[in-house]
Amino acid sequence: MCDHSLPRRRYYFHLKDPGSAITHFIGLALSVLSMPALLIHGAGEGYSRMQMAALSVFLLSMVGLYAASTAYHSFDLEKGRNRILKKLDHIMIFFLIAGTYTPICLTTLAGKGGEGLLLAVWAVALGGLVLKLFWVYHPKWLSSVLYIGMGWLCLTKLPTIWAAMPRPGFWWLLAGGVFYTIGGVLYALRLERLNTLHPHFGSHEIFHLFVMAGTACQYVTMFYL
């Protein structure tokens, strides 16, 4: 016989930042689902082991960024653990940028200075890692400057990229850079008037959408290396 005098337990999960968590969870799901297509494409093109590994670095950095962001915006933890998730979230941005460069430098720019550019990009990524580990609450504009500057290091090889990459790939690459840049500027400015749009959808969520658009464009670029 059931004892109805006992209180019922209710189990629910509370998202810390619903809009941000949901947008990048969608990004995470799409990232995971998109992995096989790019790997199959690379194998079909006869990519070397190094080039396949480079594609894998890009894909893993993409999944890593959206997983870290989803976790940070989902879990409302105590201060110390929340700080760890925040560090991971921000560090993965550097890794995604460097991860995006990796297949481009080792495929399109292989033997054309791509290796040097790749070393420079990963050096900045490791510098960003150190910055985020030891100065978590630095000014947001500083992060944006580093992200955008790192992203546009490719301008040093622009003529080579233009000559070596098929036109559709070049324009997708450029579009991705523009989306990321707009997102980075919005992140730095933190426009308060955008936070009045909806209780759970404001400037940070709009930043997330621009990041997702940038990732989508540069994912397509990988089919034109």
Give each language-model segment a name.
Residues 1-225:
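Multi-pass alpha-helical transmembrane bundles in non-GPCR membrane proteins
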